[in-house]
Amino acid sequence: MNKKLLLILLIGLVFLTGCWGKVEIENRGFVVGTAIDLEEKKGNGKYKLVMTNQLINPAAATTPSNAGNAQKGFMNISVDDESLFAASRKMRQLTNLIPYYQHLKVILVSEAVLSQPGLFTDVMDVFVRNHELRRGVKVFVTKDKANKILEYVPEVEKTPSMFLDKLANNGKNAGLLEPKKIDRLQNIFIYERSYFVPRVKLENNKIVYDDVVVVQGSNNQMVGILNAEETKGLLYITSPTKGGSIEANFDGNSINVETTNAKTKIKLTNKDKENLAFSLKVNFEGSIEEHYGQANLLTEKSLVEIEAALEKDIKKMVERTIEKVQKEYKLDVLKFGDTIRRDHYDLWKTIVDNWDRGENYFSKSTVDVKVEANIISTGASNRIKQKGKRDE
């Protein structure tokens, strides 16, 4: 009887206990952004890094933004160490709040970190292993110090991290490349593929997000930049979609055309590994949003000329990007290798180790670019003919 009573009491104690690992919400430091900078390169492959965490300021959350004594919606805490894990531990000594990463939105890594072979992988590995992190955290490279971006005070958001997160989310509709996310980078690291990462910078006290860094897959070291125009070409090749605009010249005047739909198809047309050749076709649809000049846009002749101008400009943009990536960087961030791997796997097995390294078949291949542009609307009041009728 005593044993049964003791057993009942022990079972009851389990239900009476609280959460052993419980941390009260007021003791949590909600980290929404993290910046990693290189402070010093040491010998024996060691580096001193600066880790900056951006925490939400709970006091500011309850203060009206128009109040005279309104506080910043965030606070930044920085520590340096040779180990990011150790730096994270140090962080706890600088605040009474326990860093909580489940609401992390963005990770910013400076170009200086990516300039060192393998360092970017080591940095990201710390975040990949963090069980609190969601796999959709966005990763950006910064032109200068990463923690400087976290000091930017946005007008419409409480924190620069949340502003950058929303800027990236809206980027798809603005014709910008989608950011890399942790789960995607983890897969890239495993297969040692060359890749690009969107870059952000501060210009005239504004965050600018319009170009990318190109990274060698074998050692995860940055090799160069694609500027804003080259990045648009990259977008047409790798991530065509709706959104964004392109400017064309018609009748001596500028025309802005919004992208309503864009698709790209890449095919391997010559399977001789010493003379690999691809065809790349971009199908572009757009509507004219802005036009300066007196030309009548409703005539068939005008539309044909505008479409021809668009085709010429897009083709030039795409070819310039291919030229830079193929001949200067010699790294396949354009996903041509994916076309061979998917459609011609037997061939891929014979060249994979020398695709964009060694013999570098990628840099030796040729690409024939074709663009077909179709204007589907000249504006709200000038709906034009259906494509089928124009083709008659």
Question: For the regions a protein language model found, what residue spans apply to each?
Answer:
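Membrane-proximal alpha-helical signals and transmembrane carboxylates
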Residues: N2, L10-E392
